[in-house]
Amino acid sequence: MDKFTTLEGVAAPLKIINVDTDMIIPKQYLKTIKRTGLGKGLFSEQRYKDDGSENPDFILNKPAYRGAKILVAGDNFGCGSSREHAPWALLDFGIRCVISTSFGDIFYNNCFKNGVLPIRVSQADLDKLFDDAERGSNATMTIDLQAQEIRGPDGGAIKFEIDPFRKHCLINGLDDIGLTLEKKPSIDAYETKLKTERAWA
């Protein structure tokens, strides 16, 4: 998992509440267990028309937001069924941070395990971030995980809270496997000791 320290990029405003995981990545894209290639399916029912052509009105199809790295979204983002493909799709598209007032619990947890930072803010702060994001390509924001700050295009900062353990994992690029490997010296020492104490086993 790539480390997350500071992220700077365009923020796309998605002013929709209750965006569920089926909207983020529809079920037809769940047949694969590969984490790559899912960006094309991100919000596919909103991004594409029935004939397969792009919907020019959808935010991520607008020229200013095609390269968005941050998504500013409405309340209760990522609700609905459990599917780890949702953060995979965001990440494959290029989005590493989602900001909202609240998230679906399972989606929230899956984000941290896959290198995507979900940030909870107040409604007042979200409204300010929506205003900033609507500036288009001039809406560059900086997410400073170490300082726990969102810095807008005008230099103003919004503080956010994050669990210290999850912060540690993101900054150091540690997923579940990485966390286990951190303990490898202790695991090896235990196994060596066990072989000595239970040579008969």
From Swiss-Prot:
Q: Which Pfam families match?
A: Aconitase_C (PF00694)
Q: Which UniProt keywords apply?
A: Amino-acid biosynthesis, Branched-chain amino acid biosynthesis, Leucine biosynthesis, Lyase
**What are its GO cellular component terms?**
3-isopropylmalate dehydratase complex
Give this protein's Gene Ontology molecular function annotations: 3-isopropylmalate dehydratase activity
Residues annotated as transmembrane = none
Which reaction does this enzyme catalyse, per its entry? (2R,3S)-3-isopropylmalate = (2S)-2-isopropylmalate
Question: Annotated pathway, please?
Answer: Amino-acid biosynthesis; L-leucine biosynthesis; L-leucine from 3-methyl-2-oxobutanoate: step 2/4
Highest taxon, organism lineage: Bacteria
Enzyme Commission number(s): 4.2.1.33
One biological process term in Gene Ontology:
L-leucine biosynthetic process
Q: PANTHER family, per this entry?
A: 3-ISOPROPYLMALATE DEHYDRATASE SMALL SUBUNIT, 3-ISOPROPYLMALATE DEHYDRATASE SMALL SUBUNIT 2-RELATED-RELATED
Q: Which family does it belong to?
A: Belongs to the LeuD family. LeuD type 1 subfamily.
This protein's assembly is summarised as: Heterodimer of LeuC and LeuD.
Q: What role does it play?
A: Catalyzes the isomerization between 2-isopropylmalate and 3-isopropylmalate, via the formation of 2-isopropylmaleate.
This protein is called what?
3-isopropylmalate dehydratase small subunit
Organism from which the protein derives: Rhodopseudomonas palustris (strain TIE-1)
